[in-house]
Amino acid sequence: MSAEHVLTMLNEHEVKFVDLRFTDTKGKEQHVTIPAHQVNAEFFEEGKMFDGSSIGGWKGINESDMVLMPDASTAVIDPFFADSTLIIRCDILEPGTLQGYDRDPRSIAKRAEDYLRSTGIADTVLFGPEPEFFLFDDIRFGSSISGSHVAIDDIEGAWNSSTQYEGGNKGHRPAVKGGYFPVPPVDSAQDIRSEMCLVMEQMGLVVEAHHHEVATAGQNEVATRFNTMTKKADEIQIYKYVVHNVAHRFGKTATFMPKPMFGDNGSGMHCHMSLSKNGVNLFAGDKYAGLSEQALYYIGGVIKHAKAINALANPTTNSYKRLVPGYEAPVMLAYSARNRSASIRIPVVSSPKARRIEVRFPDPAANPYLCFAALLMAGLDGIKNKIHPGEAMDKNLYDLPPEEAKEIPQVAGSLEEALNELDLDREFLKAGGVFTDEAIDAYIALRREEDDRVRMTPHPVEFELYYSV
């Protein structure tokens, strides 16, 4: 879509406002709204100035001016605002050069795609992420000098089997780890997910399926079609926006936290990906599970750099409460056909055109632009340096005896470990100027602040364990 088409949309839809959206370092969407009459052809060349110092990890107050540059191809009508509003996604540019800001996640993703093409290895990378989420009825939390607390409730929660409700308790709720695929009334979110699908498609996503996920208390997934990398990251931001707002309409609250509840499965964001050149899938071949040698090298790069990638793909302290054995979380850095206990799976496909790999350790707290870019850069490093991943692991990795398990590398065990690994293993990200040292340092500093706060805050379980010592 061109700027001319956007100007036509403004008239055809009697648009009153234009909502300029961008994504901060942590992955949260931000926005500023302007009257539609402010938008003309020059607007798409000059953009809009804003204060970058107010965004965590970005500019200092002494050099705060930045440019929101609208990407006309992303224009879509907002389905939630009362007044007709057009959403346009923006890149963050430096005002002096009008080049992509080195810490802008969307600009980083676009540079990664440019770098891919510059290598001559491929011209297209496709991503098919699968973010999971929870829908709750009530969430209360807080932390202060006098104490910390969190309380979750949902009509589907297995703990509510004996709860007294006005009108009676109707039962029909999924057990712990028992939520996968039951029909209503056990699956109480059918209509909510259907509405999410309709709104997502209204906003340009292609929905392939939706279903209840494994965990009790409202874990769900909506599956959408793959796309090129930056476009798919844009779609993940739309996906989250729709999930949050449709949930709100239904009187629910949605979360993409990786592990909101102890004792049941957490939420992942498995990432399917493949490379192609001139329309030919480069991951299809005659090696293991129908993969090409390039695909194996790509896997080798992801495994080699996995702990550094964890800092971007699993970016919260909560992420590492999911990445533990026993809850279908992929902690072993191995690859396998069909085997979901491996961190990298090769799905069964009906045609070589669909041949791909699935990296299973990312979670939906990740900034999609940074997560996808890091995975791509690791894979390209694997191809360039012919990093073979070793033999596939087709046995159930969850059941390995300890002496075998210790021979297989694992993902980072904590955010602190992941950030340390990113600090040490960053050169693959800097190839082609995709990530800069300044961007990586700022990201690490931002996440260390969170890690320090969690580490220094007394936890209720500590009182259970140690109060009476």
Swiss-Prot record:
Domain of life per record: Bacteria
Pfam families xrefs: Gln-synt_C, Gln-synt_N
An example molecular function term from Gene Ontology annotations: metal ion binding
Sites bearing O-AMP-tyrosine, chain numbering: 398
Main location: cytoplasm
EC top class named in words: ligase
Binding site for Mg(2+) 2: 132, 213, 221
Function: Catalyzes the ATP-dependent biosynthesis of glutamine from glutamate and ammonia.
Protein's UniProt name: Glutamine synthetase
Annotated source species: Escherichia coli (strain K12)
Taxonomic placement: Bacteria, Pseudomonadati, Pseudomonadota, Gammaproteobacteria, Enterobacterales
